[in-house]
Amino acid sequence: MKLNLSPSDALRVARLKKITEENDRILRLYADYLNLTPRLLDAWTVRDLAADCGIPAADAFRALFCASIGLEIPDNPDDRRLERVYIQPGVRCLSPAPYRNDAYVKTVRFGDLSVGKWRFTHGEYHAFEPFVCGHPVLTSDFREIPQIGFFEERFSFPSVTENGVEWMTVTPNEAETMRAVIAEAHGRVLTYGLGLGYFAFHASQKPEVQSVTVIERDSDLIGLFRDCILPQFPNRDKITVLNADAFGFTE
């Protein structure tokens, strides 16, 4: 069906179409880099450019990152706009201190322990290895800015592998995406999905939370959590894990 739009509405639609295309393009570029070559830029390369140009290492990384994902900043005005509206506000150098001092990370010990097919260990990000860190930011004009973080040093995080394959982790992204809902938790809390118990841990730490009920359908995960992780929680008596499907439980 053909729509007869006013000139102003036609302009708005054209702008929205352009923004949607740019949202899609930046997501594809980020996904290719993060999935295929996340450690392409090493610390030596970044710091060498920073020293040569007399700029902070974080700025050197962003410049190299732009080139690595295929943006032609000097010659292409569209690419310069992508760098300005997506990469400058969305690709951030992070301090590792808040994540290393997270109460869950400091309380729950993930030594090299094997339990059947499971192994408790640590994964790591290399210096200047970018990763998703937080929910995308939606601007007033419907631009979606992915939040990408990186550290200037190596950073390790709790990890569980299944038959040698990374299965679950507690990364800065988990901390960032759960921060708001943890802050709002109160009373009797119900949550779907156990993970490694990060949300349940932090919710149970709050005095205003009476109980935390977790619905999890993976019985193996529940056993692993009850045997190896839950005993380390200070407020474990507040937590109940039910083996059920979330949709079935809701009905």
Model-derived regions: residue spans:
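Conserved class I S-adenosyl-L-methionine
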Residues: 184-197
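Conserved SAM-binding loop and adjacent beta-strand
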Residues: 164-177
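Conserved SAM-binding loop of SAM-dependent methyltransferases across substrates and taxa
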Residues: 196-208
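N-terminal auxiliary segments of SAM/dcSAM-dependent transferases
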Residues: 1-151
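Short polybasic amphipathic segments
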Residues: 156-162
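Well-ordered alpha-helical segments embedded in enzymatic catalytic cores
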Residues: 177-184, 199
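Conserved SAM-binding motif I beta-strand of class I
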Residues: 211-216
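S-adenosyl-L-methionine
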Residues: 218-251
